[in-house]
Every structure is written in C-alpha cells, then in structure tokens.
Amino acid sequence: MIGSEIRMAKLFDKGRALVVALDHGLVMGPLKGIENPVEVVAKIAKNGPDALQMTPSMVKLVKENFFSRGSPMLITRLDTANVWRQKYKVYNEGYYASIYTVKDAISAGADAVVTYLVVGYGNDTVEGYNLSVLSSLRKEANDYGIPFIVEPLYVTKDNPDSVKEVDLVKYVTRLASEIGADILKVDYTGNKESFRQVINVAFSPILIRGGPKTNTTEEFLRMLRDALEAGAKGVTVGRNLWQAEEPDKLAKAISKVIHENADIGEALKILK
C-alpha cells in the first residue's frame, strides 16, 4: 500500500488535481476534439494538468508526453460500457466489459487506474458482473500499490449521460466507497448545498466529472468553482476542454481555478 500512498501524494501534491480524460473513444468512438490524440495531447500536456487519463493503447501514440520529470501523471482506463452510446446504436440492456488488467496498466506506465461502476442497467446480471470485476481489480490494484479510481454513475435509457439527482449520486458514491475506491470520480449535482451531501457520504477524495460540453466556458468554470467550494478535490475534464477552440489556454485557466483559487473572471482573462 506504500506505493499507492506515494502516487496519491504526487497526484494531490498541490492539494487538488486537474485530470484530463481522453479515453472517450472506448465508449463513444472518435469524438470531435480527440480524432487525433497526438495533436490534442501535445496541446494540453504542458499547460497545467496533473494527470492525463487514457487507455493503455493510446499511451503508445503519445508516450513522449510522459518522459520528463515535469510530465503529467498517467491514469489508465481498464473497462468500458455501452450505456452512453447514442450516435451509432442505442443499447438494449447495456453491457459492461473489463478490457485491461492492472498489470497491463502498469506495463504502460500508469500511476493510477480508473474503472466504471454503472448502476441502472436493464439487466441486473450485468450490474452484478460490474461489481464482481471491480472487486477483483481493487484487489489487484492493492497488490501492486497503485491507486484505484472508481467512476460511479446511475444511468437510465432516456438519459444520454447519467442521472445527477442528489440521492442517486449519493447512493452510487457510497457504493463505490464501500467497494474500496481510493479516489471517486462523481457527477456534480448542480449546487453546492446538495453536493456537500455527496462529499459527506464518500470515504475518499472526490473529483467531479466534467460531463457533456456545457453551453459556455464560463458555465463550466462556474460549476468547477462551486464544486471546489463544496469540497471537491478537483476535476476530471474531457469534452469541456478538448472541444474548446483553444484547449491549451483553457487548460491553463482551469489549472488556475483549481490550484490558485482563481475566480471566474481571472480564469476567463487567460482565454482572451
């Protein structure tokens, strides 16, 4: 467990963490902004993120971005599900699949691993399988001394993302905590008061999910600022960053909010 403590301390060495998620292709295909991983990672890697989140396969394409002492840490995705797939084929009951092992992640250079916990499939057997896989992965992560991140989500077929109703977010957050997550990647519930309730039921630090792209950058930054004030320890952001016109500048702005407690106005100045 000493290894896990060391890696956790590095990720949160500034008290909070900015993680950039680039693993969407495993679920949603080549989304706008990450069609070319080499280009987008080059724009983002040196502009403030504490870690980049991707599959072990993507690491092969962008490995040079992790070579230096000042490089971001690497978080690798181990699994996938189809419950967010809308463009190509809407799912029936939904599936969950384990793709990589913790050993695969470590071989790729990972400093932490991340998995889904999806509640609300049309088939209880799939949900049970998801839980059993997480149990095995948690044990493997503990054996190797690498932080185990869980992304707990409540899904319904009529919602293309995930349900952010506070009681349901609290439920999946506590479920992931009881499984043994070292870090939780959780939906923001819309306001500080309700999100404090989520923070209070968690056993581990919470990073909010960036979620689908917001209408404006200011809207995203305000959500982030509110979440931090409620007790979140950072963010894992994807579409709201790499679908922006200038992701390099926005990465700097987000980092300033997280690490320097900058207000929205200060952060927006970086984008001008």
From Swiss-Prot:
<protein>
    <recommendedName>
        <fullName>Uncharacterized aldolase SSO3226</fullName>
        <ecNumber>4.2.1.-</ecNumber>
    </recommendedName>
</protein>
<feature type="active site" description="Schiff-base intermediate with substrate">
    <location>
        <position position="185"/>
    </location>
</feature>
<dbReference type="Pfam" id="PF01791">
    <property type="entry name" value="DeoC"/>
</dbReference>
<dbReference type="InterPro" id="IPR041720">
    <property type="entry name" value="FbaB-like"/>
</dbReference>
<dbReference type="InterPro" id="IPR050456">
    <property type="entry name" value="DeoC/FbaB_aldolase"/>
</dbReference>
<dbReference type="GO" id="GO:0004332">
    <property type="term" value="F:fructose-bisphosphate aldolase activity"/>
</dbReference>
<keyword id="KW-0704">Schiff base</keyword>
<dbReference type="GO" id="GO:0016747">
    <property type="term" value="F:acyltransferase activity, transferring groups other than amino-acyl groups"/>
</dbReference>
<keyword id="KW-0456">Lyase</keyword>
<comment type="similarity">
    <text>Belongs to the DeoC/FbaB aldolase family.</text>
</comment>
<dbReference type="InterPro" id="IPR002915">
    <property type="entry name" value="DeoC/FbaB/LacD_aldolase"/>
</dbReference>
<dbReference type="InterPro" id="IPR013785">
    <property type="entry name" value="Aldolase_TIM"/>
</dbReference>
